[in-house]
Curated annotation (Swiss-Prot):
PROSITE patterns: ALPHA_CONOTOXIN. Residues 17-39 form a propeptide. It comes from Conus pennaceus. Pfam families: Toxin_8. This is Alpha-conotoxin Pn1.2.
Amino acid sequence: MFTVFLLVVLATTVVSFTSDRASDGGNAAMSDLIALTIKGCCSHPPCFLNNPDYCG
């Protein structure tokens, strides 16, 4: 019975770890999308003036 318990804990840990890694990739993709959107904004003078912190 203890062996079954250990297998369940191990399986849960592996699934959780791989889910976290997949989610990190999604977060990185979202950061890239936000960066591209901000860069697009910075090329337009009205948007640039409204967002000086992002456009530097």
